[in-house]
Amino acid sequence: MHITILNGPNLNLLGTRQPEVYGATTLADIEHMCQRKAQALGLEIEFNQTNHEGVLIDQIHAARSESDGLIINAGAYTHTSVALMDAVASVSLPTVEVHLSNIHARESFRHTSFLSPVALGLICGFGATGYVMALDGIWAHLTAADSARP
């Protein structure tokens, strides 16, 4: 099974950007954590980051033919992008939305997620561990779906 993990704007600055909110873990650290977890679960992952909404949409579209599931931390686009919501809905892949911080405990504009209505699940507030939790969750969903097939 193949999982695409997408990261949106400013996540390339993790480790130095507002460590009091996002922690000291870098995106490279998170990728390494995901690689270890994926290997333990027998998954292959593709890990990407971009600051550009259109590139995220292109990567979501590409996942349609390359992946069995999607994990996405869309950063601030979570709260603003109908286009990302439409892209996720259009590919019909099980999708887990991840956020390092608890978006519901922050500014009110962060309480709205355009992705949640089209996602299988949402994990927020657990820092970098949320990505590992997302891999566990999507693996459990996919293997349960496989075992339910005749």
Swiss-Prot record:
Positions of the record's site feature: Transition state stabilizer: R17
GO terms of molecular function: 3-dehydroquinate dehydratase activity
Keyword terms, alphabetized: Amino-acid biosynthesis, Aromatic amino acid biosynthesis, Lyase
Chain residues that bind substrate: N73, H79, D86, L100, S101, R110
Pathway(s) annotated for this protein in UniProt: Metabolic intermediate biosynthesis; chorismate biosynthesis; chorismate from D-erythrose 4-phosphate and phosphoenolpyruvate: step 3/7
EC number: 4.2.1.10
GO biological process: amino acid biosynthetic process; aromatic amino acid family biosynthetic process; chorismate biosynthetic process; quinate catabolic process
Keyword Amino-acid biosynthesis: yes
Catalysed reaction, written as an equation: 3-dehydroquinate = 3-dehydroshikimate + H2O
Top-tier EC class: lyase
Record CDD domains: DHQase_II
Residues annotated as catalytic: Y22, H99
Entry function: Catalyzes a trans-dehydration via an enolate intermediate.
Subunit note: Homododecamer.
Family: Belongs to the type-II 3-dehydroquinase family.
Protein's name according to its UniProt entry: 3-dehydroquinate dehydratase
Gene designation: aroQ
